[in-house]
Amino acid sequence: MLEIKNLYFRYSRRSPMVLDGVDLELRPGEIGIVLGKNGSGKTTLFKTIIGIHKPEIGTLNFDGTDLLKLSRRQRAEITAYVPQRIQFGAMTVYDTVLSGRISRFGLNPGKHDRFAVEQILDDMRLNDLASRNVEKLSGGEQQKVAIARALAQEPRVLIFDEPTGNLDLANEQLILSEARRLAAEKMISILISLHDLNQALALGDRFFFMKEGRIRYAGGSEMVIESVIREIFDADVRMIDADGSRIIVPVQNGAHGD
């Protein structure tokens, strides 16, 4: 289980806390959705989990292992991260995905590593692009390659920062379906930030609402209610029932009913 307790982080001693006492728990096989406005601390939290940022105070454990005591490479055997902004070198799609295996094989990939990459390319529908230069791909295609590279690490915790932002509807559904499959079949703990609240509600098992560097609310789908969304996003919404599913809709000015 991923366990974060009392996590604090700031960029300098004179700057305010960006993470201000974050507590979070996520079990194997669960999909946790981190929700909040831009600047609430979501990306900083993700970068702290994977080791880019070092917290000032707090603990960060996975299944009893203190992640803060691990090297970046050791932590890459447990955590993988797909950022919002992706940077690639001038490599093929195949080699880019294979580079995700470095935490496993070092610089000498074996047959098992190449088989794993081929399977991931197939799952992500990237076979036809395997020999293409990643820098020449569309933004959506690059996003899929970044996710495939993260999967190649065989992580126990997989973190997505707005993974569907550059994707068309078909590829968006592919990514979300893949997240569900990985959580269910491989018992990976998946942490995702999403801007689409209805997408989040349909996908998540647990929800973490962030504001000003703190997780203000955490829980299951019962936590996704109008009052919480209004407080976190400063937006007026209404929950409606549509064929047995809850849908979140914005309330237009003057559209309040009884």
Q: Model-found features: residue ranges?
A:
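Helix-to-loop junction immediately C-terminal to a conserved catalytic motif
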Residues: 50
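The feature captures the beta-strand-to-loop junction immediately N-terminal to the Walker
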Residues: 35-37
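A short, flexible loop at the N-terminus of ABC-type nucleotide-binding domains that lies
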Residues: 1-4, 8-21, 69-71
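Conserved ABC ATPase "signature" region
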Residues: 111-129
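Conserved ABC transporter NBD signature motif
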Residues: 58-66
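Conserved ABC ATPase signature
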Residues: 133-137, 141
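Catalytic Walker B motif of ABC-type/P-loop ATPase nucleotide-binding domains
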Residues: 158-162
